[in-house]
Amino acid sequence: MPLKETTGKVVSDKMNKTIVVAVENRISHRKYAKTMTRTKKYKAHDENNECAVGDIVTIQETRPLSRTKCWTMVNILSKSFHN
């Protein structure tokens, strides 16, 4: 079974070797057919602490690493230019 991969924006990097990634999904409302954006936040493992807030990253599903962390950062698609 292939592992799930998704892309999102880093919203927090305050924890050691852990980042919080916000993933936006566009869905259509069943009744009104309006397109809505749903955001979900995932904690992901960042082994080298190389991500910063604002980076666009790809994360991949993995075995549970802690109580709330079961994703790992695969690569950084674009770096942010924050201080």
Curated annotation (Swiss-Prot):
Pfam families: Ribosomal_S17. It comes from the Eukaryota. Gene3D superfamilies: Nucleic acid-binding proteins. GO terms for cellular component: chloroplast; cytosolic small ribosomal subunit. It is found in: Plastid, Chloroplast. GO terms for molecular function: rRNA binding; structural constituent of ribosome. GO terms for biological process: translation. Its main location: plastid. Keywords: Chloroplast, Plastid, Ribonucleoprotein, Ribosomal protein, RNA-binding, rRNA-binding. InterPro entries: NA-bd_OB-fold, Ribosomal_uS17, Ribosomal_uS17_bact/chlr, Ribosomal_uS17_CS. One of the primary rRNA binding proteins, it binds specifically to the 5'-end of 16S ribosomal RNA. NCBIfam families: PRK05610.1, uS17_bact. Part of the 30S ribosomal subunit. Belongs to the universal ribosomal protein uS17 family. This is Small ribosomal subunit protein uS17c. It comes from Porphyra purpurea.
